[in-house]
């Protein structure tokens, strides 16, 4: 084995020279240079500085403006809440531990940090699934008279939390476990060992199938159908400038959604899957740390893509920040007209 396994940790470094120490008790400078831990801390600080204001502002602006309290925006708010879970439950902890170069909070703190980071990430992921389904049902109209209402939004919210808990909670009760990963300053699911005493192999397979592959398939299917529907509508109305504009907006939005999802999650999932299927292989701590950077950055991507590109929300945000006046001069009528104009084919 090219790593060192302990009671509640796995360090990706051979202990042939006897230098490996518990990541809960000693700095891990044999894994990476001090400046690399400083870079990790600086990155976490950047995510906190950017992630907290934009997600908090999302919640605050929605509370301030009643017209934003629509069923679809419930899901967008759920994204903001999930991102705040990641900011406070994961990023702040990783910032502090990176400054010390080891996980100073012990196994209990590791369980809590791993749980909240996983919970926030999964809530965000399943929120994107609900958004994809909502867009598919509203735009493609597989059910002709269906209208996405408040009850459907509440059911969607419940689904995101149930599925997130179904992924984040089992390691706390003996099915798999949370251990320090990468540079040993943050915690995640144990992809590194089979750990038969906690049935780790079955949990990792379950997580990859139910909490990664299935969401990915749903998102691609829904947005693929969305693009086809919009193109078909445009083909039938060649002279409709409104439809042509909506086609471009939806296509751009879909591309950004899919690319952001892939950038955020596929590198991390791919590396984790490789590590799990190549037990004992030789890899360094940076091998897992860098992909996790992209996954954590979803706390910034999500509000920018799903909310900041919404013209109505953007106008409300500017009005809130500028004490009741919109410096861009976009009046309510133009915002309403724009929203109505693309309501049948463009994202809300």
Curated annotation (Swiss-Prot):
The modification Phosphoserine is found at residues 334, 338, 343. GO terms for molecular function: 11-cis retinal binding; G protein-coupled photoreceptor activity; metal ion binding. This is Rhodopsin. It comes from the Eukaryota. Phosphorylated on some or all of the serine and threonine residues present in the C-terminal region. Contains one covalently linked retinal chromophore. Upon light absorption, the covalently bound 11-cis-retinal is converted to all-trans-retinal. After hydrolysis of the Schiff base and release of the covalently bound all-trans-retinal, active rhodopsin is regenerated by binding of a fresh molecule of 11-cis-retinal. It is found in: Membrane; Cell projection, Cilium, Photoreceptor outer segment. It comes from Delphinus delphis. The gene is RHO. SUPFAM superfamilies: Family A G protein-coupled receptor-like (SSF81321). The modification N-acetylmethionine is found at residue 1.
């Amino acid at each position: 084995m090219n790593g060192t396994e302990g009671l509640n940790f796995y360090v990706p470094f051979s202990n042939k020279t006897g230098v490996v120490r518990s990541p809960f008790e000693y700095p891990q400078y044999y894994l990476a240079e001090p400046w690399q831990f400083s870079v990790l801390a600086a990155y976490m600080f950047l995510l906190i500085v950017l992630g907290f204001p934009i997600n908090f502002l999302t919640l605050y602006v929605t509370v301030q403006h009643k017209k934003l309290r629509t069923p679809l925006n419930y899901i967008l708010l759920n994204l903001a809440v999930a991102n705040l879970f990641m900011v406070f439950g994961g990023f702040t902890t990783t910032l502090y531990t990176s400054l010390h170069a080891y996980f100073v909070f012990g196994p209990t703190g590791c369980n809590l940090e791993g749980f909240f980071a996983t919970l926030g990430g999964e809530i965000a992921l399943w929120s994107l699934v609900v958004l994809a389904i909502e867009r598919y049902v509203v735009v493609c109209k597989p059910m002709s008279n269906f209208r996405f209402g408040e009850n459907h939004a509440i059911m969607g919210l419940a689904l995101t939390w149930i599925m997130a808990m179904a992924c984040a909670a089992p390691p706390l009760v003996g099915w798999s476990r949370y251990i320090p990963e990468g540079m040993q300053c943050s915690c995640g699911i144990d992809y590194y060992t089979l750990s038969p005493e906690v049935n780790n192999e079955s949990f990792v397979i379950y997580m990859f199938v139910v909490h990664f592959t299935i969401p990915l398939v749903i998102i691609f299917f829904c947005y693929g159908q969305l693009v086809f529907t919009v193109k078909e509508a445009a083909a039938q109305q060649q002279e409709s400038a409104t439809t042509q504009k909506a086609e471009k907006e939806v296509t751009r939005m879909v591309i950004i959604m899919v690319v952001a999802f892939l950038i955020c999650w596929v590198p991390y999932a791919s590396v984790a899957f490789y590590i799990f299927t190549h037990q004992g292989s030789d890899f360094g701590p940076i091998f897992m740390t860098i992909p996790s950077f992209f996954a954590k950055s979803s706390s910034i991507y999500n509000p920018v893509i799903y909310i900041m590109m919404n013209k109505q929300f953007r106008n409300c945000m500017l009005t809130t920040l500028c004490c009741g006046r919109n410096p861009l001069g976009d009046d309510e009528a133009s915002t309403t007209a724009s929203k109505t104009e693309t309501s049948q084919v463009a994202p809300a």
